Amino acid sequence: STILEAILDAYDEAGITRDPSTWERPAPTMQRVVDKYLEGDVKKDTVYSVFRMLQDYQIFTNDTNNCVTMFEWLKSVQVIDLTLYEDNIKKLIVSLVLDVFYAEMKQLKGSDQKDGFREIRTMILVDEAHQLMKMKFNSLRKIISEGRMFGVGMILSTQGMSDFKTDEDYSTFIKSWVVHNVTNPTKSDLASIFGASDPNLERYMSYITNAVTFQSICKLGNQVNYIEDVPYFK
């Protein structure tokens, strides 16, 4: 049994065929595909272990009534808490979410523009983003580099300025920065954000190392401002 065979069997079981008249029927869930795959005669290889984890952890629902598209799901604030999962499960879930999100994003037309401003459809906040960036997710890089056209923004929050440079230098895709207090920033870190020729690098260095809570430097394009954030309790 292959993954493709499991998918085709799940669709056949749901009564969905090449006949367009069947395409409005509820599609099989990912959980059903997982079950179909494991029902077959499969080798206990890497793919098997992944599908076994998906089944054991019950990652997906088997109720089609609970299924919506990714962009429908993101019409309200959603928080994905992966704290209790093992690293391999975290990586699997994040990879699936990013891949599905990117595929749906590409199906959208470009977001509207008016008076030089672009419509924002969805914002994604990734906390402790260094954990994702070092995992080399192709979809993460593509969402960051292509998302603006589709009205998708992404905020990558991390503790260190050098975290954005893994095998892939994510800083090259980022146009806006908000830098709070950072421990031991280097001149090269600042140069990668503000530009090596910026005459104010030493001033930025001093400000960042001495900034108190809610103080930061904001860089939007070529404009740099010292700002005081408005706390949530105000």
Model-inferred region functions:
Residues Q78-I80, I155, S176-V178:
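Hydrophobic/aromatic beta-strand patches that form the interior of the parallel beta-sheet core
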Residues S162, E168-K234:
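P-loop NTPase motor core of the ASCE superfamily
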Residues Q55-T61, I155-Q159, F194-D198:
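A short linear-motif detector with a strong N-terminal bias
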Residues S1-V152, K165-E168, S206-Q223:
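P-loop NTPase motor domains
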Residues Y85, A129, Q159-M161, V182-T183:
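An acidic- and aromatic-residue-enriched active-site/binding cleft used to recognize and process polar
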Residues M149-V152, S157-D163, N181:
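Conserved H-loop
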